[in-house]
A protein has these predicted regions:
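Walker A/P-loop
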Residues: 115-136
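Inter-Walker segment of RecA-like/P-loop motor cores
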Residues: 161-194, 360
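Post-DEXD/H (motif II) to motif III coupling segment of the RecA-like Helicase ATP-binding lobe
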Residues: 208-273, 443
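A short beta-strand element within the Helicase C-terminal
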Residues: 199-200, 373, 380-395, 420-423
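Conserved pre-motif I regulatory segment
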Residues: 52, 74, 80-121
Length: 462
């Protein structure tokens, strides 16, 4: 009989397996590398895949045990589990304050503790951080939460301290303050060398980032982390590396989409105006994508003026408005036009001083500031319940980014009955048109998203 020897980070098979079964496992626990076709031309001996099962030692990430079992079951191989993990001693749970868990949140927390590790998707605005806090409090063990952005770190810290009423440590942005519950920017993980082996509960927020190398290095250093969870508010990764999410934290256990949350009254329904912006100039042969983006998006005065006109219509209607862009130059171009008609306009991005970014964001949350231009720092993870209108001006191709951006607007807020989004849908240029189609495909997956094609500003009803 085959033994599945399970440890916190790595597991392995012990026993004699037919080489064909080993090959089946090697193939199952793999993912095709994007762009591998070209690399294979240089190295014909490579199959173009990244493998997560070693043939020689029959080792694999513990989160993939369920996939190994599927292969063994398919080939009628008998096996038994040998669990070498040491479960942390149970502690009294921390009481929760200032929050009442929704039914699905209670189910997520209880199931996650029972399963010990999980990948959990709760659509943006569904109270993912509240679930995280409740799970941390119920386990009440040494916990590390990995994040990748300063604004998210501060937001999670404030939420955990409000709900659990205990101090929460932070590592990142020049701060090293380690406590039994600590939030760390993944870029600052080198500061945690002595803390990592003591961690019982390892979590990753915005879990679609987990396939990055640093996440994996930290996960492997947390040798005693019995409980492992990844949280995300977006659709699963759009490349083939979703298997890395499973390897980090186990099987995908929960998938609560936006339409379910809207139906149950936990999010407001969105109305998405798809503004058809026709580009007159045709892309020349041989021109790069960055050159197309620069000419047709970043430096396109007509398009930028349209974005500003839509924003000003919203300001006059007293709607709090966020304009999302990708590149600093684009934001600066928009700001130059906007400042002429709205001097209070502000543009924040990754290079903006942290104090200014947090101040502007706080003013926006409080409603004292009505209009912001922002790069991707506000496109993901940041909670802005009062946001009423989102203008996506960045011609984004990523479906994950589209999910995240839309989620900025769906949160409940007093007096808010629906979310408004204007997506500048570029047509007439091949690359940009394909990006438009990608975003529309994301919106179309949610049955309660209302899509409204428009061709002029008067059709945008605020």
């Amino acid at each position: 009989m085959i033994q599945i020897e399970i440890q916190n980070v790595k597991s392995r098979l012990i026993g004699d397996l037919d080489p064909k079964i080993i090959s089946a496992l090697h193939n199952k626990l793999s993912a095709e590398v994007v762009g591998s076709y070209y690399a294979q031309q240089r190295n014909p001996y490579w199959d173009g895949k990244k493998h997560f099962f070693t043939k020689k030692g029959m080792a694999f990430a513990t989160g993939l045990v369920w996939m190994v079992r599927e292969v063994l079951d398919k080939h009628h191989i008998e096996y038994e589990h040998v669990d070498l993990r040491v479960k942390p001693k149970e502690q009294s749970s921390l009481p929760l304050h200032n929050v009442t868990l929704r039914p699905y949140q209670e189910q997520v927390v209880n199931d996650s503790i029972e399963q010990q590790r999980a990948v959990i998707r709760i659509s943006t605005g569904g109270g993912k951080t509240v679930c995280m806090a409740a799970l941390v409090g119920k386990l009440n063990l040494t916990t590390l939460i990995l994040i990748h952005r300063q604004e998210i770190m501060q937001q999670i810290k404030e939420t955990l301290e409000r709900i659990l009423q205990v101090p929460v440590g932070m590592v990142g942005a020049g701060v090293v303050d380690i406590k039994p519950i600590t939030i760390s920017m993944i870029q600052s993980a080198h500061e945690l060398k002595d803390f990592l082996p003591t961690v019982d509960v390892l979590m990753g927020d915005e879990g679609h980032h987990a396939p990055c190398e640093t996440y994996w290095q930290v996960a492997q250093e947390c040798k005693n982390a019995y409980y492992r969870y990844l949280w995300t508010g977006t659709d699963w990764r759009e490349d083939n590396m979703s298997i890395l999410l499973d390897g980090f934290a186990g099987k995908k256990r929960w998938d609560i989409n936006a339409s379910k949350l809207i139906q149950d009254g936990w999010l407001v329904p969105p109305e998405i105006f798809l503004y058809d912006f026709k580009h007159e100039r045709k892309a020349r042969k041989g021109i790069s994508y960055s050159e197309i983006y620069g000419a047709e998006i970043t430096n396109n005065y007509e398009r930028n003026k349209l974005v500003v006109d839509i924003a000003m219509k919203a300001v006059k209607a007293n709607k709090s408005t966020l304009i999302l862009i990708n590149y600093i130059e684009h934001g600066e171009n928009l700001l130059k036009i906007l400042e002429k008609v709205y001097p209070e306009a502000v543009f924040i991005h990754g290079s903006t001083e942290p104090e200014k970014r947090l101040k502007v964001l706080q003013e926006f949350k409080e409603g004292t500031r009505k209009l912001i231009i922002s790069s991707n720092i506000l496109g993901e993870g940041v909670d802005i319940p009062k946001l009423e209108l989102l203008i996506t001006a960045r011609a984004e191709a990523s479906t994950i980014a589209a999910y995240q951006a839309l989620g900025r607007t769906l949160r409940l807020s007093e007096g808010k009955t629906k979310a408004l989004i204007v997506d500048i849908c570029d047509s007439g240029v091949k690359y940009l048109e394909s990006h438009t189609n990608s975003r529309i495909s994301v919106y179309s997956k949610e049955p309660l998203y209302k899509l409204v094609p428009v061709q002029n500003i008067s059709q945008i009803i605020l």
